[in-house]
Amino acid sequence: MRELAGSPGTWSGLSLRVGQLVFAAASVCATASALGFAAYTAFCYLIASMGLQALWSLGLACLDCYALKFKKDLHSAVLLSLFVVGDWVTAILSFAASCSAAGVVVLFDRDIYACRNPQLPCGRFELAIACAFLSWAFSATSALVMFWLLASL
């Protein structure tokens, strides 16, 4: 089987997982530190989605570390099927949450001019959304690699 960049059990796969984890955690921290985020469903959904993304990425990063340390092969059909489903689910949830939160911020900023109010931390929301989109980009890349590997078995 051909070795792809981002395959499970490789350094590039570990770097994809760490990127997902770091940006998902940064998104959660930025959103949770913004006062009043709980009043808006899109930001609650963003925290839930990025929390799930962080947990999934942490688990697979640990699995990649284990595989690298003990030189294990993670290219079995069962494992790749699990990775494909998990990556696609988290990627779709991350994208939906990022888009919905971005839509709310665009509404606040461009339509009702609520970001002029200093009590609404639009800058933190924008930072959280940017981190969420970056986490989604890593997740979508990983999902495509896993799907490609599964298809090549």
From Swiss-Prot:
Sequence ranges on the Cytoplasmic membrane side:
1-20, 64-76, 150-153
Q: Which residues lie on this side of the membrane: Extracellular?
A: 42, 98-128
Q: What membrane topology is annotated for this entry?
A: Multi-pass membrane protein
Mainly localized where? membrane
Provide the leader sequence positions: none
- Which keywords does this Swiss-Prot/TrEMBL entry list? Cell membrane, Membrane, Transmembrane, Transmembrane helix
Sequence intervals crossing the membrane: 21-41, 43-63, 77-97, 129-149
InterPro entries reported for this sequence? CASP_dom, CASPL-5
Q: Which Pfam families does this one have?
A: CASP_dom
Entry GO CC: membrane; plasma membrane
> Where in the cell is the protein located?
Cell membrane
Subunit-structure text: Homodimer and heterodimers.
Q: Which family does it belong to?
A: Belongs to the Casparian strip membrane proteins (CASP) family.
Q: What is this protein called?
A: CASP-like protein 5B1
Source organism of the structure: Oryza sativa subsp. japonica
